[in-house]
Amino acid sequence: MLIAQRPTLTEESLNPQRSRFTIEPLEPGFGYTLGNSLRRTLLSSIPGAAVTSVRISGVPHEFTTLPGVEEDVTEILLNIKGIVLTSEYDEPVVMYLRKSGKGEATAGDITPPAGVTIANPDMHIATLAEDGELEIEFTVERGRGYVPAQMNKQDNAEIGRIPVDSIYSPVLKVSYRVEATRVEQRTDFDKLILDVETKPAISPRDAVASAGSTLVELFGLCRELNTQAEGVEVGPAPVAEETNPEMNIPIEDLNLTQRSYNCLKREGIHTIGELVAHTEQDLLDIRNFGMKSIDEVKEKLQSLGLALKASPLGNFDANNLEGGTFFSPEDE
């Protein structure tokens, strides 16, 4: 059986609800295969909770108004669709909102049952006047994707029960791109970069884990056709090495010239650990990054007892290296 190098998955947290995941190295072509599958699954198949119907006291249907309430019922329903929920129950549950007197009614005024959490309590629902009074009964269900109000409508529903569009998906945006990456002498491997933004109901990490679990279950159906069939086997995980804390230092702390710094940032090199993973030739391949920049980087790294990939640590004599692949500042 062919054995492929085990890819590594790293997460860069951009904010609590957005992360960038990098998976590399992948066999040529697998970047798009994996990226497209994850994106579609994240957008359509991550389970979540949403309001499916409401009953508003004194309201027979959605095309009406309430005395003492600034918004009409249609506007209130639009606001209700923006409530972000989590629910531990597979069956429908009910929660209530009761508000009277002048002020703003928000999702934080709702009383949910145990096991149901409102992730955005500041969500505006309605504005009440002095004589305003608002009582709403919400039905909450779990599901996936998007379900229009028409599909939430029940034939035997009581009068005044108004179905609502349900946006179950806790994932807001997913994008990906595939770049080439080097493995030893080969440069045709894929690096998948996946950008995921979610609602407060779930973290990007948990959303990607859920999508991966779903895909494993589905692709497992194909494997069951013949469990003895050969495929590409992913190799073992590399043995973890002791992490040097200096590897996490941002390159800003190297005090490089603006030209060198901008070139490295544009290439996506943000830390010293990412920098020392490159060879001199890798850096020379960066646009506008020449030998003066190489010498500057090597000098800064040498002061920390570090060196570029495949470079010897500390001082060295370039004349002793075969092929002349390394140069000291005096060689120019």
Curated annotation (Swiss-Prot):
One of its GO terms (cellular component) is cytoplasm. Keywords: DNA-directed RNA polymerase, Nucleotidyltransferase, Transcription, Transferase. Residues 1-226 are annotated as: Alpha N-terminal domain (alpha-NTD). The keyword Transcription applies. Its EC number is 2.7.7.6. SMART domains: RPOLD (SM00662). The keyword Transport does not apply. It catalyses: RNA(n) + a ribonucleoside 5'-triphosphate = RNA(n+1) + diphosphate. It comes from the Bacteria. Residues 245-332 are annotated as: Alpha C-terminal domain (alpha-CTD). Homodimer. The RNAP catalytic core consists of 2 alpha, 1 beta, 1 beta' and 1 omega subunit. When a sigma factor is associated with the core the holoenzyme is formed, which can initiate transcription. Belongs to the RNA polymerase alpha chain family. DNA-dependent RNA polymerase catalyzes the transcription of DNA into RNA using the four ribonucleoside triphosphates as substrates. This is DNA-directed RNA polymerase subunit alpha.
